[in-house]
A protein has these predicted regions:
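Short, conserved catalytic/metal-binding motifs centered on acidic residues
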Residues: 33, 53, 107
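Secreted/periplasmic proteins that engage bacterial cell-wall peptidoglycan
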Residues: 47, 52-61, 81-84, 88, ...
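Mid-length scaffold segments of soluble, non-membrane domains
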Residues: 69-123
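Long, amphipathic alpha-helical surface segments
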Residues: 2-15, 19, 26-48, 60, ...
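Acidic/histidine-rich, surface-exposed loop or edge segments in extracytoplasmic proteins
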Residues: 55-73
Length: 182
């Protein structure tokens, strides 16, 4: 089964341009995470209530992010690079099939970066990708659309909804399956 064009079209022109130019996984992932996470120099609570900063980091220099924490742009760039490299290394260690650069970026965003390794290891996605079922793995990414038990598909257009999670899963799936239909 080929990836539906509508999923590929959900990626930004910037991300698609990087892929078509042959960019590395770190470059693709940086662009994608900048688009999805933003980059806050001031600590804020994420959707789960955790204090985070930069592109969602919960720790800086081994210390937890706390209310009122502020960082410079330069420091956030360092934190973001460290987090990016950490999740890409996780993909290299834990995904047993060969991957293209966009596929590495998609998996890194979904598994270690967004849902966390603890939820990833027992997931259908993880089992399918490592069994070589790439289409099945990409389908399984799109199942992760609940936030606190709430189905995010039902929140489109709502203030304080979580519909962005549905879009993100579609985009992560598109990256993870980039090129398998060729």
């Amino acid at each position: 089964m080929a990836m539906p064009p509508k999923l590929r079209n959900k990626l930004s022109a910037a991300v698609v341009g990087l892929i078509l130019a042959g960019a590395s996984a770190p470059v693709i992932l940086d662009q994608f995470l900048d688009e999805k996470e933003g980059n806050s120099l001031t600590a804020y609570r994420d959707g789960g209530g955790l204090w985070t900063i930069c592109r969602g980091a919960t720790m800086v220099d081994g210390k937890p992010v706390v209310q009122g924490m502020r960082l410079t742009q330069s420091k956030c760039e360092q934190v973001n690079a460290k987090e990016r490299d950490k999740v890409l290394a996780w993909v290299e260690r834990n995904i047993k099939v060969s991957l293209t650069e966009p596929q590495k970026a998609g998996i890194a965003s979904f598994c270690p970066y967004n849902i966390g390794p603890g939820k990833c290891f027992p997931s259908t996605f993880y089992k399918r990708i490592n069994a070589g079922d790439r289409n099945g793995a990409c389908e399984a990414i799109r199942w992760w659309i609940k936030d606190g038990g709430r189905d995010c598909r039902l929140t489109k257009g709502q203030k304080n909804g979580c519909y962005g999670q549905v879009e993100r899963r579609d985009q992560e799936s598109a990256l993870t399956c980039w090129g398998i239909d060729q």
